[in-house]
Amino acid sequence: MAAWACSPASFAAQAEPGKGLVLAPRQDFVAPPAGSYQLPIIQPAANGWVLDGNWLPRRLSSYTHGALTMLSFVYTYCTDPMGCPLAYETFATLRRLVLADPLLHGRVRLVSLSFDPAHDTPQEMVHYGGSNARSKVLPWAFLTTYSVNFLKPILDGFGQDVEVELDDKGKPTRTRTHLLKVFLIDAQAQVREIYSAAFLQPEVMMTDLRTLALERAGLPRKS
């Protein structure tokens, strides 16, 4: 995996999908048919206290149980096109694909959780989400935490590294360096796949979602 440094800047112009952002470069890999393979359990999804868009405290487990979940960590002022904006645009593409898929419609949620609770208040996260944060058709939760003390156990539980860069005087800046990861979580809150930036391909992710949906429905696996 590669590390992507995200520089502080306004994300407002990029917060809505379809505004010039690009998805990850296409890979030659072609996913096998949905249901023809298994996704083993990697680890339990981490839990902890988060804040929703109304400043209400919620357990993260309420966003990782009961549905197939795609979760990523972001921060709203990241502008590196292969960092947080890539995660956002990929989720926006997934949302459109899921809504058009009868097997997945009503069975999938998206979660974007902030790396920077000091800046990314619930209001900032709602603004970052735009119309996607308000949609009732397919849940896309834009969450933050009270503080780094609440965030760190969640990051540690997922194995998501992040570093705050220092300036020439050794003082913290607002630039965060992290490995872009997206976590696929099943309805029992078990992580079943972790995607890096290089493999953030909506078509592959859709096939994995369909595989877990078939598994949950108890339908025969394809040979």
Question: Where do the language-model regions lie?
Answer:
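Extracytoplasmic
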Residues: 43-45, 63-70, 105-108, 120, ...
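N-terminal targeting signals for export/organelle localization
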Residues: 1-47, 51, 222-223
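Structural microenvironment flanking redox-active thiols in thiol-disulfide oxidoreductases
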Residues: 86-154
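A local structural motif
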Residues: 42-45, 136-140, 165-171
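Thiol-/selenol-based redox modules, centered on thioredoxin-like
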Residues: 156-223
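Residue-level recognition of short loop/turn positions
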Residues: 54-55, 188
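Short active-site neighborhood of thiol/selenol oxidoreductases, capturing the structured segment around
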Residues: 59-90, 110
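Sec/Tat-exported extracytoplasmic proteins
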Residues: 43, 67, 74-77, 82, ...
